[in-house]
Amino acid sequence: ESNQGYVNSNVGIELARYETTNYTESGSFDTDLARFRGTSDSIHTSRNTYTAADCATGYYSFAHEIGHLQSARDIATDSSTSPYAYGHGYRYEPATGWRTIMAYNCTRSCPRLNYWSNPNISYDIGPDNQRVLVNTKATIAAFR
């Protein structure tokens, strides 16, 4: 799903690898993290072998977290304009509404589209996370 979001938004990067693991979440972040540190050591081995910088999935969460690593911010109502004033997700709220990968949920809940905010793709909007990702992709690729 992450790579498809990059294609949909003309980002020009591709995530190189993913793995699945047989794990049932406990409902507690602290418990899950402790289990990863003691009983799921294969996660750490794979992370080091393949120089992974992030681990997550579900409802575009992995792409969302990668976006933060690349300096993309959540939504334009976030008062921070650093490092990119244009680098926010987008949320459209009339009627049922929708939101891009980085945007918070709508007031009345709305679907998250597998798109990065990009005024040149599907919706004529101002925020432009696609440009943030393009600007930072070489730095991220060279991370590990």
UniProtKB/Swiss-Prot annotation:
Q: Which reaction does it catalyse?
A: Cleavage of Xaa-|-Asp, Xaa-|-Glu and Xaa-|-cysteic acid bonds
**Enzyme Commission numbers on file:** 3.4.24.33
What are the protein's UniProt keywords? Hydrolase, Metal-binding, Metalloprotease, Protease, Zinc
Q: PROSITE patterns, alphabetically?
A: ZINC_PROTEASE (PS00142)
- Gene Ontology MF annotations: metal ion binding; metallopeptidase activity
Supply the Pfam families for this chain.
Answer: Reprolysin_5
Cofactor binding description? Binds 1 zinc ion per subunit.
User: So where does Zn(2+) get bound?
Assistant: H64, H68
Task: Cite a single GO BP annotation.
Answer: proteolysis
Swiss-Prot/TrEMBL cofactor(s): Zn(2+)
Q: Does the keyword Kinase apply?
A: no
Please indicate which superkingdom the organism of origin belongs to. Bacteria
Q: Which residues form the active site?
A: E65
Family the entry assigns:
Belongs to the peptidase M72 family.
User: What this chain does, per the record?
Assistant: Metalloprotease, specifically cleaves on the N-terminal side of aspartyl, glutamyl and cysteic acid residues.
What protein is this chain from?
Peptidyl-Asp metalloendopeptidase
Give the organism the record lists.
Pseudomonas fragi
